[in-house]
Amino acid sequence: MKCIANELYKGKFMSDLAHITNFVQITPAVGTAGQPRAEYFADIAAAGYSVVINLAMADSDHALPNEGNLVASLGMTYIHMPVDFQTPRPTDVARFIGLMRSLDSESGDSKIFVHCVVNFRVSAFMYHYLKLAKGYTDEDARSPMFEKWAPYMDDVWANLLTWTQEDISG
């Protein structure tokens, strides 16, 4: 299976969520983005997403203090898995991969919306999930967000992208 994000950017797939900061439809069942505004969660629910995973810290820029309640009120499951942007750990990636494995089915029964502040942290975690759990090639696992992030990526995140299964598993 190939990441459809690059096809999305070529205009082959349209999205009702393009108004959300840095939205990328990674696979038919997984979309990623930066922090949505409160009113955008209704659009996420209307697009068929049943799970929202937030990797941002509770005190991140534009964080919504009531995000979990808002998501639940729209009939979606909310999972907050905060990852410190300054010090992501292999255990964070391992937990994320485990969570995604439990939620992401080949049948596409549930759609998963994963976000952080600007979709950088999520793109890196999705890269590892797609490579290690789904068998994507390095190229196919890369989100188009990497091109946008490259000029700003620090050594912490550049190093994280080189982690192997052994690094993540401990």
Question: Which stretches of residues belong to each language-model region?
Answer:
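Short coil/turn linker and secondary-structure boundary residues
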Residues: 15, 36-39, 88, 136-137, ...
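Glycine-rich nucleophile elbow surrounding the catalytic serine of serine-hydrolase chemistry
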Residues: 120-124
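Active-site-adjacent beta-strand anchor residues
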Residues: 34, 115-116
